[in-house]
């Protein structure tokens, strides 16, 4: 009986963890789609308060324009990975641009709000 309870607990726990990762992955995909459509307000809605202050609509627009100037036009996303760094959940989405590939690193706080958003070289973590 004890083994059954432990097994059920572990299955439930893994389902909750997977659900959390899946939600963060979906939010990260929404960010990329919103960048492509110049819908920066949708991105900001997923930010925590610090990010809302640091990256208003104008700065997000500038970030995306600069990326497209330096890296070429955005083409597609491919590999998606997830990680846990201290108390933060992190998703990495490989973004393919015309001239190079970058990873979009999205850091989530415990409330599933974006607490960090970075475009980094594809081999960096």
Q: Each predicted region: which residue ranges?
A:
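Short solvent-exposed beta->alpha transition segments
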Residues: 26, 41-86
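Sec-dependent N-terminal signal peptides
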Residues: 4-19
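Short, low-complexity N-terminal intrinsically disordered segments enriched in polar/charged residues
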Residues: 16-33
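Exposed beta-sheet edge and beta->alpha loop/turn motif
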Residues: 79-125
């Amino acid at each position: 009986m004890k083994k059954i309870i432990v097994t059920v607990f572990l299955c439930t726990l893994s389902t909750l963890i997977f659900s959390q990762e899946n939600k963060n992955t979906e939010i990260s995909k929404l960010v990329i789609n919103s960048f492509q459509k110049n819908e920066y307000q949708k991105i900001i809605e997923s930010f925590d308060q610090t990010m809302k202050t640091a990256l208003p609509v104008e700065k997000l627009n500038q970030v995306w324009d600069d990326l497209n100037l330096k890296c070429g036009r955005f083409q597609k996303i491919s590999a998606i990975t997830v990680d846990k760094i201290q108390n933060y959940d992190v998703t990495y989405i490989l973004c393919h641009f015309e001239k190079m590939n970058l990873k979009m690193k999205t850091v989530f706080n415990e409330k599933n709000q974006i607490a960090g958003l970075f475009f980094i070289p594809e081999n960096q973590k």
